[in-house]
Amino acid sequence: MRNRFVEIPTPDGAMDTFITRSEEGGPFPAVVVFMDIWGVREELFEIARRIGTVGYYCMVPDLYHRQGGIRYEYRDANNRMISLNRLDEARFNEILATRGGLTGAMVVEDTGALIDFIDDGEPASTDAMGSVGY
């Protein structure tokens, strides 16, 4: 598998994006793995890698790029992500405020930037695209 991080230009600045795909072949159907409220993290990169192993070109964009690439990782003693409703009020409100700063229009704009990036010569096809995530 080929894994890399790239900065994809958007009207609001560079968007860090994790990309994974097979070593050989292509063009691959593209799949966008959309992050959840917590932001991008290793678990999402692993989901993308698993999808990539069966012949897809996977992208995990940092949709919080306008806010400085925020990532939340609150874990319990067993290193599992803590549920949002188990956070104290201050952390809970901080995460909701971050998520509230991301609109549907922004996600659509960022998705368009991903498509433009692929169309600029990546070994992927925008003729057949999919998405998973939140």
Please annotate each region the language model reported.
Residues M1-Y134:
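N-terminal cap/leader regions of alpha/beta-hydrolase-fold enzymes
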